[in-house]
Amino acid sequence: MLARCLVSCGLSLAAITTLAFAQSPSPNGVVTLNPRGAISTGTDTWSVGARAGDFIFVAGMQGVDPATNKLVEGDEARIRQAFLNLKLIAESAGATLQDCVRLTVYVSDLHRFAPLVSKVQAELWGKPPYPPRTMFEVQRLFDDDIVEIDSIFYAPTKK
């Protein structure tokens, strides 16, 4: 009896856990993305991404370590983590970095961080072609971070 109860409770817990991560599409089919392993949005009013038809939109990603939800140390490491965060979200919806059609990069110091952004992006993408990219210097980013990158991917649901 105890074993049956444990199995039943375990299955119920698994179903609840699955439901917590399932995202219902909007009336027009937009599905929000909050994949396992991504940074936590907590109880805030945003998702890390959304799929709308064949396009995947990833929210501005910072160099936050998903395991701790804290900014990683070091400029290059933080920029790399921002790219890795957007990569994870895109991959959760079936895209690769090569499917990126738009990058918008915000940095707190253009002269200091633009070369690092280019270096890390080249390492992660490998070789051209690279997606269109616009980089802005901004006065301040959330948590006084140095970089935030938002992105759009094209990944047809039917190939």
Language-model segments: which ranges?
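N-terminal presequence-like segments and the immediate start of the first folded domain
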Residues: L2-L84, L88-A93, Q98-V101, V107-K159
